Curated annotation (Swiss-Prot):
<dbReference type="Pfam" id="PF03129">
    <property type="entry name" value="HGTP_anticodon"/>
</dbReference>
<dbReference type="InterPro" id="IPR004516">
    <property type="entry name" value="HisRS/HisZ"/>
</dbReference>
<dbReference type="GO" id="GO:0140096">
    <property type="term" value="F:catalytic activity, acting on a protein"/>
</dbReference>
<dbReference type="InterPro" id="IPR045864">
    <property type="entry name" value="aa-tRNA-synth_II/BPL/LPL"/>
</dbReference>
<keyword id="KW-0547">Nucleotide-binding</keyword>
<comment type="similarity">
    <text>Belongs to the class-II aminoacyl-tRNA synthetase family.</text>
</comment>
<dbReference type="InterPro" id="IPR015807">
    <property type="entry name" value="His-tRNA-ligase"/>
</dbReference>
<keyword id="KW-0436">Ligase</keyword>
<dbReference type="InterPro" id="IPR041715">
    <property type="entry name" value="HisRS-like_core"/>
</dbReference>
<keyword id="KW-0030">Aminoacyl-tRNA synthetase</keyword>
<keyword id="KW-0067">ATP-binding</keyword>
<dbReference type="GO" id="GO:0016740">
    <property type="term" value="F:transferase activity"/>
</dbReference>
<dbReference type="InterPro" id="IPR006195">
    <property type="entry name" value="aa-tRNA-synth_II"/>
</dbReference>
<keyword id="KW-0648">Protein biosynthesis</keyword>
<dbReference type="InterPro" id="IPR004154">
    <property type="entry name" value="Anticodon-bd"/>
</dbReference>
<dbReference type="Pfam" id="PF13393">
    <property type="entry name" value="tRNA-synt_His"/>
</dbReference>
<dbReference type="GO" id="GO:0005524">
    <property type="term" value="F:ATP binding"/>
</dbReference>
Length: 428
């Protein structure tokens, strides 16, 4: 049997992983500047963590989730999204306590799993960058989250993105809207897909997210939740949009927007990218919203929360098209060549000294001929080559060459310990 990776997974090889590292580093630094701290949760949880949060009728739980019974008979699921595990950790570790500063704001960069049809930017194992903030119901918290999402995409170099927003209102609004959807879809129930017929009795809001052609023909005339928002929900939504306008963040009021998970309340949003080189129509790369009752679902206290998640695979597709500089392979600072007896170990010592000073450095462990060593230095995109020869070593000197223009300089072995000064001389 040929050994190969499972369908829906990819190997991110060293030639590509550097760009992923850059993107994740930008994201980490961005979140830290906003005082969001990293949280790491298990890649698998008890099944109920996701069935409670995402909803039994959601496609994520009913069709896409990897779940199984482990050897102890426990019903386990691989993480299909990031929020539920973070909420579980928030409750289990009593992070709602008075000794924890609120809002409690975290970020994560995790691998996640969904059984979907693999396609460009969508795999069965994928990566998600996300943030969650617990403890504030203020519209400022929503705006903070929206602003962070907007500014992070800008900092990463994403272009042509558009913010779509909608409001799902409060519990009373959802209940009234639920009844309106039932009344609308019930007369045509027999014409709906099997999934939507089931959803009609369990969670008719899910029908609005259907991709089935049998359902889609009824969606344009379906009731809009904006018509059911109460005064409080409308005022909250207006406060948020007013602040977005003051911040210069453009948005589209999207009455058709619903999120694919059941836990959202209040504002929901998606950032969509239009790029004809990638997709025929605008595609979502970031989505999120407010979820004020999810902590209670996990037996925690009433806690408002808001967050977003980015599909990293889709993000990388966009960035490769729109910010190709992130995908330039980075070289190393120094490659150390050597020739002659007694120079091999000195190359090791020189590399160690350079690394201790914060430089990247490599030497040829295979001790090839000097010409081959220089060829390797070129292939690894070294900025400088240091050459150690037996005679030069005996005299306590060595040669450093800048490959971009061929400029060279001789220096003493002691100068190795102050390499930044040497580089400055080369720059003169």
């Amino acid at each position: 049997m040929k050994v190969q990776r499972p369908k829906g997974t990819v190997d991110i090889l060293p030639g590509e992983s550097g760009s992923w590292e850059k993107v994740e580093s930008i994201a980490r630094n961005f979140f830290k500047r906003a005082n969001y701290r990293e949280i790491r949760t298990p890649s698998f949880e008890n099944y109920e963590v996701f069935s409670r949060s995402s909803g039994e009728t959601s496609d994520v739980v009913s069709k896409e989730m990897y779940d199984f019974n482990d050897k102890g008979g426990r019903h386990i699921a691989l993480r299909p999204e990031g929020t539920a595990g973070v909420v579980r950790a928030y409750v289990e570790n009593k992070l709602y306590g008075p000794d924890v500063v609120k809002p409690f704001s975290v970020y994560y960069i995790d691998n996640t799993f969904r059984y979907e049809r693999p396609q460009a930017g969508r795999q069965r194992e994928f990566h998600q960058i996300g943030v969650e903030s617990f403890g504030s119901d203020s519209p400022l918290a929503d705006v903070e989250t929206l602003m962070m999402a907007h500014d992070l995409l800008a900092e990463l170099g994403v272009k042509n993105y558009e913010l779509h927003i909608n409001s799902l209102g409060n519990a009373q609004v959802r209940e009234a809207y639920h009844d309106a959807l039932v009344n609308y879809f019930t007369p045509v129930k027999d014409q709906l897909s099997e999934d939507s017929q089931r959803r009609l009795s369990q969670n008719p809001l899910r029908i609005l997210d259907s991709k089935d052609e049998r359902d889609k023909k009824f969606l344009p005339n379906a009731p809009k939740i904006v018509d059911y928002l109460d005064d409080e929900s409308r005022e909250n939504f207006k406060t948020i949009t007013d602040m977005l306008e003051q911040l210069g963040i453009n948005y589209v009021m999207d009455d058709d927007l619903v999120r694919g998970l059941d836990y959202y309340t209040g504002i929901i949003f998606e950032f969509m990218v239009e790029d004809k080189n990638l997709w025929e129509s605008a595609t979502t790369i970031l989505g999120g919203g407010r979820y004020n009752h999810l902590v209670e679902e996990f037996d925690g206290p009433e806690t408002p929360a808001v967050g977003f998640g980015i599909g990293e695979e889709r993000l990388m597709l966009v960035l490769k098209e729109q910010n190709p500089d992130l995908f330039q392979e980075e070289g190393i600072d120094f490659f150390i060549t050597n020739i002659g007896a007694g120079t091999e170990f000195k190359a090791v010592e020189v590399a160690r000294s350079l690394r201790e000073q914060g430089f990247s450095a490599q030497y040829d462990v295979d001790q090839k001929k000097l010409k081959q060593q220089f060829r390797k230095a070129d292939r690894v995109h070294a900025t400088f080559v240091i050459t150690l020869g037996a005679k030069e070593l005996e005299n306590g000197v060595l040669n450093i060459k800048r490959l971009s223009d061929g400029k060279t300089i001789d220096l003493s072995l002691e100068d190795i310990n102050n390499m930044q000064d040497v580089i400055n001389k080369l720059e003169d």
